[in-house]
């Protein structure tokens, strides 16, 4: 069973980013994972570009907007070292897909080797948290990275019975 707490830290959280497009979001958040050493061979820009391509491939197959102004873009590729999560809260909602706006983004990176169940577990835990009104309210009101991280860890580690 995957532990979300092991996949995210304060260096992977960004609040009130002033980004205007989905492209800016995907590139900026992928760059964060790249700079934080979450992708293999972090000196090679092609690695970051490969991860961004994996994100776009997923978006083109089906939008990763999940409602409540949340998006969960995710990429499975050989350029990801180990599963990781990055979170961004934007200053303003942006157009994510037709009739879908997003302000809160969880980006998931999973290595091609780990993709199967691990990838689905992460999506389920984040999606379940997003369905919780209190989780969304707390993330909206969080004042700093530390508080945001505590909220994410608290809700993602809850055992759900429903």
Where do the model's predicted regions map?
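Cytosolic covalent-transfer regions centered on His/Cys nucleophiles
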Residues: 1-162
């Amino acid at each position: 069973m995957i532990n979300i707490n092991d996949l995210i830290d304060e260096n992977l959280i960004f609040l009130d980013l002033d980004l205007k497009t989905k492209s800016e979001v995907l590139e900026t958040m992928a760059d964060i994972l790249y700079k934080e050493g979450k992708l293999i061979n972090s000196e090679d820009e092609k690695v970051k570009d490969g991860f961004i391509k994996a994100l776009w491939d997923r978006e083109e197959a089906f939008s990763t907007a999940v409602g409540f102004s949340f998006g969960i873009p995710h990429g499975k590729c050989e350029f990801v070292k180990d599963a990781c999560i990055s979170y961004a809260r934007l200053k303003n909602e942006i157009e994510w897909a037709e009739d879908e706006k997003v302000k809160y983004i969880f980006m998931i990176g999973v290595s091609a080797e780990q993709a199967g169940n691990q990838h689905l577990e992460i999506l389920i835990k984040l999606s379940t948290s997003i369905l919780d009104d209190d989780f969304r309210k707390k993330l909206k009101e969080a004042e700093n990275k530390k508080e945001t991280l505590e909220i994410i860890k608290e809700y993602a580690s809850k055992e759900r019975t429903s």
